[in-house]
Regions:
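Structural signal for short hydrophobic segments within the conserved structured cores
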Residues: 64-66, 111, 165
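Conserved functional loop/turn residues at catalytic and ligand-binding sites
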Residues: 20, 43, 81, 108, ...
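Class I S-adenosylmethionine-dependent transferase superfamily signal
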Residues: 30, 104, 126-130
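Short glycine- and Lys/Arg-enriched binding-loop motifs that mark or flank ligand-binding interfaces
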Residues: 2, 16-20, 112-115, 134, ...
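Conserved SAM/SAH cofactor-binding pocket of Class I
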Residues: 1-99
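Conserved Class I SAM-dependent methyltransferase catalytic core
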Residues: 117-172
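Alpha-helix initiation/capping motif
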Residues: 41, 75, 112-119, 145
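Mobile active-site "lid"/loop adjacent to the S-adenosyl-L-methionine
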Residues: 91-121
Length: 172
């Protein structure tokens, strides 16, 4: 969130889409601290969207929520019109899930954890499909696993993205 808000100072983002919004904390924070005209968020889970909507209302933040598996149910008029896409998708490699702390693996929905064999399945889909939804010069922002930076950088380069930066978050 901090990186997006920092970048918004120079890029003047007006529209942003959060993919896999969960409880809605990312778009709510962006709505509270940023200067966005349009904030959209999607999740595959109706239950998560219910919590996200409730949280947005409690915080008086306008967000358009959609039940969607990535981009599948988004309004067509968004194509080519988004300034930025943000996502904290499932990024844990399938083989590592059993090693997670009990309070994580036993209470988080599996589809919120499992990022496929190498943890990059959702990134691949967003990177590939995101280009048609972003404006020219649009931005992708991701939360990633501590050891996925170089693999994601290569993936982004393969799809022609530039100005790629990997930063450590507050947790390191």
């Amino acid at each position: 969130v901090e990186t997006i808000l920092e970048r918004q100072q120079t890029e003047k983002f007006k529209s942003i889409l959060d993919i896999g919004t969960g409880s809605g904390c990312i778009p709510i924070s962006l709505g509270h601290y940023g200067k966005f005209e349009n904030i959209m968020a999607v999740d595959i889970s109706q239950k998560a969207l219910g919590y996200a909507t409730e949280n947005a209302v409690k915080n008086n933040i306008k967000i358009d929520f959609y039940e969607s598996d990535l981009f599948t149910n988004l309004p067509a008029e968004w194509k080519g019109n988004l300034d930025a896409i943000v996502s904290n998708p499932p990024y844990i490699p399938k083989k590592d899930i059993e090693e997670l702390m009990t309070e994580v693996k036993d209470f988080e929905p599996m589809n919120a954890l499992d990022g496929g064999e190498d943890g990059l399945d959702f990134y691949r889909a967003i990177v590939e499909q995101g280009r048609e939804w972003l404006k020219d010069g649009g931005w992708l922002f991701f939360e990633i696993g501590y050891d996925q930076g170089e693999d994601l950088r290569k993936l982004l380069q393969e799809f022609g993205y530039t100005d790629i930066e990997v930063r450590q978050d507050l947790a390191g």
